[in-house]
């Protein structure tokens, strides 16, 4: 029988690219994220190059749950309905990815990570640990583009403004030829 004392530490691939350390404050409000009981999400968009081991972090963000809720309040009702429908379809028709494989293939399509050019990894965290409520997961850039396509113009504009204000990257990264390079908050 497997031990229930698993290591729930946040994996290093969810550490800040800039510091090599765990995110310590909310990218939006500056709240201390490493306190026990502080729930937050980490979202990183990554571009990898075929035939190379090099990867670029397109953007990374750690946002406390309070700020996530505030961001969700800015999303139009139309976009929320479209996203809920998209998530339901993805869960019903998506790939069956085992929890231990959640970062090795796209949760929606099952496409192996090594075959993807662009993808986002996401984790729900509580202080210095992964939350047991949801395993980390990976979504391909193509699926993120599908999600972006169902957002209203107002929501897309809000998220683009949010990305530029709090996350970056430089505008040349946010182009139509970089799948999954837009902030979607998944």
Predicted regions and their residues:
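N-terminal intrinsically disordered, low-complexity tails enriched in polar/charged
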Residues: 1-22, 54, 183-186
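Short Cys/His-rich Zn2+-coordinating modules
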Residues: 2-14, 44-51, 83-95, 122-123
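Compositionally biased, flexible interaction segments
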Residues: 6-7, 17, 21-30, 78-82, ...
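Phenylalanine-focused residue identity feature
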Residues: 14-17, 23, 59, 86, ...
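Short recognition patches in nucleic-acid-associated and regulatory proteins
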Residues: 20-58, 101-137
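Short metal-binding segments enriched for Cys and/or His
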Residues: 53-83, 131-159
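Long, contiguous alpha-helical scaffold regions
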Residues: 88-186
């Amino acid at each position: 029988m497997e031990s229930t004392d698993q290591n729930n530490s946040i994996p290093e691939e969810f550490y800040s690219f800039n510091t090599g350390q765990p995110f310590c404050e909310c990218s939006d409000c500056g709240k201390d994220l490493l306190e026990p009981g502080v729930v937050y999400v980490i979202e990183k968009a990554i571009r990898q190059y075929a035939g190379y081991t090099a990867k670029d972090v397109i953007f990374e963000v750690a946002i406390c749950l309070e700020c996530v809720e505030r961001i969700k309040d800015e999303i139009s009702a139309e976009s929320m309905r479209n996203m809920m429908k998209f998530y339901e379809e993805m869960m019903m028709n998506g790939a069956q990815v085992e929890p231990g494989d959640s970062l090795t293939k796209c949760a929606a399509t099952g496409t192996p990570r090594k075959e993807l050019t662009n993808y986002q990894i996401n984790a729900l965290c509580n202080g210095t640990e992964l939350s047991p409520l949801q395993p980390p997961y990976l979504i391909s850039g193509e699926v993120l583009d599908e999600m972006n396509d169902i957002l209203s113009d107002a929501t897309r504009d809000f998220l683009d403004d949010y990305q530029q204000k709090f996350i970056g990257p430089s505008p040349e990264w946010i182009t139509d030829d970089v799948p999954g390079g837009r902030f979607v908050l998944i």
